[in-house]
A protein has these predicted regions:
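Short, small-residue-biased leader/transition segments that mark boundaries at the very start
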Residues: 1-5
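Flexible "arm" and connector segments at domain edges
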Residues: 9-73, 77-117
Length: 117
């Protein structure tokens, strides 16, 4: 199933299951929640470095030009999914609820924000 996943779309639920299986088969076990949260911050930092170099005012250092934005985003997602898995969060349901919340609570917030005009 690892090879065929590249040939089709993948749901969030499938990603959670694939990562859970990988952790159990190849990763021995999940790191604890605190360790994974720290790893998440590290991965977000790596993503931030690329964004600041590519879109911000900083320039790339020697050897950084081949850094891959998509791969760093995927690293963030991987660790986030690990945290969701180990804490029993169904990300599909959580995201649906979050979108509903934004649609009800924040539906006019940005449209009415004069700073964005």
């Amino acid at each position: 199933s690892e090879m065929c996943i590249r040939d089709r779309n993948m749901t969030i639920q499938e990603a959670q299951k694939i990562i859970d299986n990988w952790i159990k088969e190849k990763g021995v076990r999940y790191f604890n929640e605190l360790t994974n949260t720290t790893i998440l911050m590290e991965e977000v930092g790596e993503l931030a470095r690329i964004v600041s170099r590519k879109y911000g005012e900083q320039s790339f250092k020697e050897g950084e030009k081949d850094l891959d934005l998509a791969d760093e985003i995927a690293d963030v997602m991987w660790v986030l999914i690990c945290i969701a898995n180990q804490t029993g969060v169904d990300l599909t349901e959580a995201l649906k609820k979050n979108i509903d919340k934004k649609n009800s609570r924040d539906s006019r917030r940005h449209l009415d924000n004069k700073k964005l005009r």
